[in-house]
Amino acid sequence: GMGIFSTGPSFKDAKIAMDVGLNSLSVILEASKYGTFKSIPEKEIFRMEYWPLELAKVKISSQKLKGQVAVITGGLGGIGYATAKKFQKEGADVVLIDIIDPKKINLDLKGMKYIKCDITKENNVRKVFDEISTIYGGVDILISNAGFATVESLEKLSKQQFDKSFDLNLFAHHYFVKHGVEIMKNQQTRGV
């Protein structure tokens, strides 16, 4: 069998490299029906690839976060979404984690990955990071943004409200950082 392994500075670039590789393989296989494939000499490849008109097509990215995978909890809320758009503009591959159904709100999620998750359950958070690692190969930036405020005086605050507040505003952040940092340590990158 045959296979192709592609890499790139970002997930999008790696997918583009994969598409180019698969297309090239397809052309070579189709051409082999009519004869044998022989590449042009390496000197000619260099001349063709570094021809000034070819080089003019290459853009040098000024995006500071190109190739970085940013994971944001509470990504569909105001602060989370604004952060996601900024990170995306700077070139990051953005993963939004939220319990909100994006179909119920009107946000442009084009180019972003959305994962529905109740982050108050540690096992859910672990599964989300497993999924992100499978898709993107790792994590570079963690934004632990999810949270809510209970508007109630302490004397009227029920045990259930208190527990819910701590589950999301404290324990969920711990689970998120714990599992995210574990991936960063395994990658041997410092992360953000």
Residue map of PLM features:
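Conserved NAD(P)H cofactor-binding loop of Rossmann-fold oxidoreductase domains
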Residues: 145-150
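The beta1-alpha1 cofactor-binding region of Rossmann-like NAD(H)/NADP(H)-dependent oxidoreductases
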Residues: 117-127, 159
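Active-site loop of short-chain dehydrogenase/reductase
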Residues: 138-139, 184-192
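Substrate-binding pocket helix/loop in short-chain dehydrogenase/reductase
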Residues: 153-154, 158-163
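Conserved glycine-rich cofactor-binding loop
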Residues: 76-77
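Conserved glycine-rich Rossmann-like NAD(P)H-binding loop of the short-chain dehydrogenase/reductase
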Residues: 92-105
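A short, exposed helix-loop element centered on a Lys and neighboring polar residues
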Residues: 177-178
